[in-house]
Amino acid sequence: MLYTDGEKVLCFHGPLIYAAKILKAEKWTGEENVTGQVGPHYLVHYDGWKKTWDEWVPETRLLKHNDENLARKATLQEAAKAGSLISSAEKSAASTSAASSLKRAKDSELPDRKSASRGTKRSREHVEAEEEFLKRPEVKISLPDELKLQLVDDWENITKNGQLVPLPRNPCVKDILDDYRKHYLASKRSDPSKQRSPQLVDEVLKGLKLYFDRSLGQNLLYRFERAQYVDYRKKNGPKMGDGDVGNARTANGSMGGEMEPSNVYGAEHLLRLFVTLPMIIVHTSMDAESISLLKEHLAEFLSYIVREKHRLFVREYETASPAYHRISST
C-alpha cells in the first residue's frame, strides 16, 4: 500500500485537490463496490469538512503531501477561480443582453401598428431564445486525474519555467485522432458485442479537429507561447490557425492542409481544448441526447489518451532563449 493509516495526503475531489487524512486502508478485490475499481482503496477525511464527506477513494485519486503537489493544488485552485470568473462574466453578459433586448422591445414604438406587432414579436422571440440558452444545462466533461496533473505540469512548464513545447509535434493532433480511429474500430473486431459506428466516430473526430484548428490561435495558447506561434506562422504559413469556431466563412478551410494547427501541435494543446470544449458545446444546437452520446465518445477518447500518454505527450519541454523571453514580454 502506498499510503498508511493516519497519513496526511492530498486528494482529488471533482476537479480540485484538497488536504485530507487517511483513516483506513484496504485492498479491494471485487468490482462490486462504491468505486467500481479493484486494488488499494483508502477511507479519507477532508480537512475542515464534516464527517459526512468521508469517502472511500482509489489510490489514483491520492497524492503525497509534499511541496510539489501543494503547488499543483494551488495551481488548480487559481485555474478554477479564473474559470469561474469567465463563466460568471459570460452569464452576466448574456443576461445583460437579454435585459437590453427586453428594454428595446418595450421602448420601441412604431407608427405602423402591424409593423410594430411584427417587430415586437421578433424581439420577443429573440429574448426568449436568449433566455432559453441561459436555461440550458451546463455541459461537464470529466478529465481523468492523470490528465488533470498533465495540465498542471504543462501550465507550470510554460508559465513558471519559461519553457515551450517543441514544434512541430510528433505525433501531431491529426495523427492522434487517426490512431484513435483505428483503435476504436479495431476494438469492434476484437469484441463484436460492442457497438462501433465508423460514421459516428468519424463525426466526433472531425468535430474535434475542426474545433482544435479554429480555437488554437485564439483560445489554446498561453501568452508566453504566442511569440512561438507567430514565428512558426511566418515561416510556414500566415493563415495557420486564423479560423474562428463560430465563423462559418473561415470554418470552410481558409488555410492549406499542411499548415493547419492539427498538423503542428500535439497532445499538450489538444488536452487544453477539453477545458474549453464544454463552452463550445453549450453554444451548439445539439439536443440532450446528442450531447450525452458525444460525452460518452469523449470519455472513451480521454481514456485512450491516458493509456497512450507516455507516447503522446512530449517528454522534455525546450528552454526558451533569452532573446525569446525579451520578445514574448513585449
From Swiss-Prot:
UniProt subcellular location: Nucleus
Record flagged with keyword DNA damage: yes
The record's annotation in Pfam families points to:
MRG, MSL3_chromo-like
Give the span(s) annotated as Disordered.
96-129
- Alphabetically, which GO biological process terms does the record hold? DNA repair; DNA replication-dependent chromatin assembly; negative regulation of antisense RNA transcription; nucleosome disassembly; positive regulation of transcription elongation by RNA polymerase II; regulation of DNA-templated DNA replication initiation; regulation of RNA stability; transcription elongation by RNA polymerase II
Q: Where does the MRG domain start and stop, copy by copy?
A: 135-329
Where does the record place Basic and acidic residues bias? 104-115
Question: Where are the annotated coiled coils located?
Answer: none
Q: Which GO terms describe its molecular function?
A: histone reader activity; methylated histone binding
**Family annotation (InterPro entries):** Chromo-like_dom_sf, Chromo/chromo_shadow_dom, MRG, MRG_C_sf, MRG_dom, MSL3_chromo-like
Entry superkingdom = Eukaryota
Name the keywords, alphabetized. Chromatin regulator, DNA damage, DNA repair, Nucleus, Transcription, Transcription regulation
Primary localization class, coarse: nucleus
Under SUPFAM superfamilies, the record lists: Chromo domain-like (SSF54160)
**UniProt xrefs under PANTHER family:** MORTALITY FACTOR 4-LIKE PROTEIN, MSL COMPLEX SUBUNIT 3
Subunit note: Component of the NuA4 histone acetyltransferase complex.
* Family under the similarity heading: Belongs to the MRG family.
Q: State the protein's purpose.
A: Involved in deacetylation of histones, chromatin assembly and chromosome segregation. May act as a transcriptional oscillator, directing histone deacetylases to specific chromosomal domains. Component of the NuA4 histone acetyltransferase complex which is involved in transcriptional activation of selected genes principally by acetylation of nucleosomal histone H4 and H2A. The NuA4 complex is also involved in DNA repair.
- Protein name listed in UniProt: Chromatin modification-related protein EAF3
Species in which this protein is naturally found: Mycosarcoma maydis (Corn smut fungus)
Taxonomic lineage from the root:
Eukaryota, Fungi, Dikarya, Basidiomycota, Ustilaginomycotina
